């Protein structure tokens, strides 16, 4: 496979970057190109048919600062024909009322611009009150809690990447 997937992530503490690297490795280094959004241009999103968007939920239901800076520029990208998967890091105990909100905010914007969401993830095994990342009872993407459930991260990533390989047709 040639590098078909662009994985764009923002990170504040390094957790989301670490997860991005694990996801890349699970797909295969020759398939996924990582882009730290603090150093990327929004036009870089145009280079890929398949996208993976990673963002931690910051503060109380907010986008991570690098994504916040690019958010309005997403209006300039045509996502029609692109399959887009999302993953987020968050704390379901400390922030139970807005767990994974950031990926819900990004998914809504990108879907409005024509992106087709793939990689929905079950809420089974999570304990939270509310999330902007819910669509029809599922998360819009892989929900990770490195604060309270880090022991589940590797297995969740393996399952999600297998699901994405099928949905991306790889």
Swiss-Prot record:
Keywords from UniProt, A to Z, are: Electron transport, Flavoprotein, FMN, Transport
Domain Flavodoxin-like as annotated: residue spans: 5-165
Q: Does the keyword RNA-binding apply?
A: no
Per the entry, which co-factors are needed? FMN
- Among the Pfam families in the record, one is Flavodoxin_1
PROSITE patterns named in the record? FLAVODOXIN (PS00201), FLAVODOXIN_LIKE (PS50902)
Q: Which InterPro entries match?
A: Flavodoxin, Flavodoxin/NO_synth, Flavodoxin_CS, Flavodoxin_lc, Flavoprotein-like_sf
In the record, what terms sit under GO molecular function?
Answer: electron transfer activity; FMN binding
Query: GO terms for biological process?
Result: electron transport chain
What is the stated purpose of this protein? Answer: Low-potential electron donor to a number of redox enzymes.
Family label: Belongs to the flavodoxin family.
- What's the protein name? Flavodoxin
């Amino acid at each position: 496979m040639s590098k078909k997937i662009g994985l764009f992530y923002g990170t504040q503490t390094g957790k989301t970057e670490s997860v991005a690297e694990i996801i890349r490795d699970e797909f295969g280094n020759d398939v996924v190109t990582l882009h730290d959004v603090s150093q990327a241009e929004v036009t870089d999103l145009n280079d890929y048919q398949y996208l993976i968007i990673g963002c931690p939920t910051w503060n109380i239901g907010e986008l991570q600062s690098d994504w916040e800076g690019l958010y309005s520029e997403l209006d300039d990208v045509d996502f029609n024909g692109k399959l887009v998967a999302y993953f987020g890091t968050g704390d379901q105990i400390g922030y139970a009322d807005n767990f994974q909100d950031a990926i819900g905010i990004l998914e809504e914007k990108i879907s409005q611009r024509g992106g087709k969401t793939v990689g929905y993830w079950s809420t089974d095994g999570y304990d939270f009150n509310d999330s902007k990342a819910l669509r029809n009872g599922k998360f819009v993407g892989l929900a990770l809690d490195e604060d309270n459930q880090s022991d589940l991260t590797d297995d969740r990533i393996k399952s999600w990447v297998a699901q994405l390989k099928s949905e991306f047709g790889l």
